[in-house]
């Protein structure tokens, strides 16, 4: 049997809306498909991460080399020795807030190089 799309289109033009709805239902049943338009999930998790433009750098664990981490925190924040030590001892604690992605990753790298465990939030 040859497929004549022009004849099918001509038949569809002459059909009523009710006939076309029945045709769609029959095609769905016959082939196990749906004519409904797919709906995308709003606000997928990947989209939130991509849209984020400011990050908080959180020290989650100072690690074994606490003195090096205190120095890195002091350099990054401009805080005094006691304040920097208090931040490190109080881990988990936010070291800096609202940094752009590049600055946040730089600070994270410096803290990790000093031996700390760091998370970007």
UniProtKB/Swiss-Prot annotation:
| Keyword Ribosomal protein included in the entry's annotation | yes
GO cellular component entries? cytosolic large ribosomal subunit
GO BP terms in the entry = translation
A Pfam family it matches: Ribosomal_L12
Keywords attached to this Swiss-Prot or TrEMBL record, sorted alphabetically, are: Ribonucleoprotein, Ribosomal protein
Endoplasmic reticulum recorded as keyword: no
**From the Swiss-Prot or TrEMBL record, what is one GO molecular function term?**
structural constituent of ribosome
InterPro entries xrefs = Ribosomal_bL12, Ribosomal_bL12_C, Ribosomal_bL12_C/ClpS-like, Ribosomal_bL12_oligo, Ribosomal_bL12_oligo_N_sf
Q: Per the similarity annotation, which family is this?
A: Belongs to the bacterial ribosomal protein bL12 family.
Which purpose does this protein serve, as stated in its record? Forms part of the ribosomal stalk which helps the ribosome interact with GTP-bound translation factors. Is thus essential for accurate translation.
Which NCBIfam families would you find in this protein's record? L12
Q: How is this protein organized at the quaternary level?
A: Homodimer. Part of the ribosomal stalk of the 50S ribosomal subunit. Forms a multimeric L10(L12)X complex, where L10 forms an elongated spine to which 2 to 4 L12 dimers bind in a sequential fashion. Binds GTP-bound translation factors.
Q: What is this protein called?
A: Large ribosomal subunit protein bL12
